UniProtKB/Swiss-Prot annotation:
A GO CC annotation given for this chain: male germ cell nucleus
GO biological process: epigenetic programing of male pronucleus; pyrimidine-containing compound catabolic process
Annotated compartments: Cytoplasm; Nucleus
InterPro entries xrefs: SHIPPO-rpt
GO molecular function, a single term: chromatin binding
Entry keywords, A to Z: Chromatin regulator, Cytoplasm, Developmental protein, Nucleus
Keyword rRNA-binding: no
Protein name: Protein STPG4
Oligomeric form and interacting partners: Interacts with histone H3. Interacts with histone H4.
Function description: Maternal factor that plays a role in epigenetic chromatin reprogramming during early development of the zygote. Involved in the regulation of gametic DNA demethylation by inducing the conversion of the modified genomic base 5-methylcytosine (5mC) into 5-hydroxymethylcytosine (5hmC).
Amino acid sequence: MDQPAVATASTSIREDLVGGESFITASKPAQKTSSFEREGWWRIALTDTPIPGTYHLKTFIEESLLNPVIATYNFKNEGRKKPPLVQRNNPVLNDLPQYMPPDFLDLLKKQVATYSFKDKPRPSPSTLVDKDQSLQLSPGQYNVLPAPVPKYASRSCVFRSTVQRFPTTYFIPHEGPGPGHYNVKMPPTSSVTSCFQSRVPRFLPSCSKTPGPGAYTTLRQFPKQSPTIAKMGQEHSLFFNNNNWLLK
């Protein structure tokens, strides 16, 4: 129930203390609204729509079944719901049908071969030239023209062609012995030489007069060393120093 709005006009009395006179001033009227109107704005947006769960939404499986086009998922243009070959409740080995699939040779024998190595005969040379087909002449009333291609005896039974293919001018026999009646002379091969063509002997025994190890006896060192120096050289290897300061 709506409550009526109450409009009140407030007045204020103001006294002028200085002059001792009083006067009345009127303010603007204020309109008050009820709490029902302030909080009921959302009721206007409500519409008469069904609540969730009052209608059924179709799933993607139900929508796929409504498609009039049959789904083809194999090579035989059959749908996914392919009926089984054998309807059985308990699939055991004895329920399988006994059959023998046809061999591929049997399938090939049923196919008709449409190929052959024999070709159509060549058209007659007389039909290759332009002539009047309306002429009806009896034999002896015309002169037969020579064939455009000379004919030769056919030597092959496979290719029924009498056209000369390879001229004999390229296969004229030459004078001389045949294959196997002569010896082939090979040219002499030269040995491998150096690129510098040097004739200096490389790996020859060197003629040196220096005797080898063991071919001579060592001489006693001169001047003779004192026993103290000789002992120091044996103990400290002083005689094998690179400087050889003891031998100088």
